[in-house]
Amino acid sequence: MKRSDLLERMLNWKCECDILVIGGGATGLGAAVDAASRGYRVILLEQHDFAKGTSCRSTKLVHGGVRYLAQGDVSMVVEALHERGRMRLNAPHLVKDMRFIIGNYRWWEKPFYAIGLTCYDLLAGRKALGRSLPMLKRSVLKEIPSLKHEGLRGGVVYHDGQFDDSRMAITLALTAIDKGGVCLNYIKVDC
């Protein structure tokens, strides 16, 4: 849909809407999709490109919450894995597998990571992106030759998700428009 069509849709509503979203970042776009999919007349206005601010400064990871596992927050891990699975289901073209290698330098790190990441894989179940595995020192150095050699004992590989945040933003805007909403950028709102 062209910008002129969106402006016309907005004018046909006589600039009245049920919900006005100011800001086209991830949160604003998500709110616009949710509102439009529920049948609300929603207008989203963004003063720059969609997802130009904080949303474009993300890690680009759709992580399953592995860091929460180290803190013992299992419920947060389960929630993060559930959300990652939902995102892979709803937008498989935007989420891809990303391998991470963690070098082990202390004797206790190999069993620590092996146990933790095995739990992570079990919690992920069918939503797992790949299996966590221990690595020999030579395998770690073959994949990451610039890693500090001294004291390296081996490593572990695990999988998490990565996504393209700008493609996600455009996909959300187009989905909101598809559902009957209006999303316009380069419109500044002065209150």
List each model region and its residues:
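Extreme N-terminal leader/targeting segments of oxidoreductases
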Residues: 1-19, 34-38
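Glycine-rich Rossmann-fold phosphate-binding loop(s) that bind the pyrophosphate
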Residues: 23-25, 47
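N-terminal Rossmann-fold NAD(P) dinucleotide-binding loop
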Residues: 28-29
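Gly/Ala-rich phosphate-binding loop of Rossmann-like dinucleotide-binding domains
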Residues: 32, 36-37, 175-177
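Glycine-rich FAD pyrophosphate-binding loop
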Residues: 36-56
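Dinucleotide-binding Rossmann-like beta1-alpha1 core, especially the glycine-rich loop
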Residues: 59-143
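Helical element adjacent to the flavin cofactor pocket in flavoenzyme catalytic cores
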Residues: 156-191
